[in-house]
Amino acid sequence: MYRRFSLNDEKLEDFKRGNFMIRFLRFNAPFKSETEVHKKVNDMYIVYSGKAKVLLSDDYEGGREVEPYEIRGCNILNYETIDMKSGDVLFIPANTSHQLLVEEGSLTIVIIKIPEE
């Protein structure tokens, strides 16, 4: 199946096929996502424009399971801060706690959800 996407479209739509999903998102500062851990899904962040910080760690505590294998609202412990800008790509493996921060300007990002199975 063929489908064309443009990040210049006013309304970006997600694409989902089976367990594979592409999300097109725009955020304006200040923005702080909820912390999350995907037990069976890898994330790939592709920054189209703007800049952001991503907190990452294999170490976290607490949180709530919002659906099977998906944790939200955890406390990220011993995290590393990754600075991202236009053109950067970040692969976040399953079981890694993460949080996205936009501190100034705006961010347009493509997030690809890649199942482990």
Language-model segment annotations:
Residues 24, 54-56, 109-111:
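Short hydrophobic/aromatic-rich beta-strand segments that constitute the beta-sheet cores
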Residues 39, 43-54, 58-59, 66-75:
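Short, conserved beta-strand element in jelly-roll/cupin
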